[in-house]
């Protein structure tokens, strides 16, 4: 059976995937994620910018199925901290996860 996910289109120029749901997270969505909560509150008085977006393709159910997505992290800081994602936990701890930088410069700090 061929999954509808195969029909998704990846656009490397603008970092989008056509035809899949996209989640957007703004500064206000990450309350409690930054170490300097005062800097976060101050930054919110200047606006509620987009911090990151994730386009996700849901896989078929069952062992060996691949769930994949395309995340785009925006440049910027809150106080002395760079923009970040909220993060997530895997229900199945042994799940593999791969990150590939497509464009730009930066660091990924991952927690296990």
Regions found by a protein language model. Give the residues of each.
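Active-site region of the double-stranded beta-helix
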Residues: 21-112
């Amino acid at each position: 059976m061929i999954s509808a996910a195969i029909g998704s289109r990846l656009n490397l120029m603008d970092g989008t995937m056509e035809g899949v749901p996209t989640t957007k997270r703004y500064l206000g969505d990450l309350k409690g994620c930054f170490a300097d909560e005062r800097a976060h509150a101050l930054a919110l008085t200047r606006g509620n910018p987009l911090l990151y977006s994730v386009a996700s393709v849901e896989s078929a159910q069952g062992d060996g199925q691949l769930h994949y997505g395309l995340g785009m992290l925006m440049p910027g800081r809150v106080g002395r901290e760079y923009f970040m994602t909220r993060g997530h936990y895997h229900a199945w701890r042994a799940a593999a996860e791969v990150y590939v930088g497509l464009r730009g410069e930066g660091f990924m700090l991952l927690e296990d």
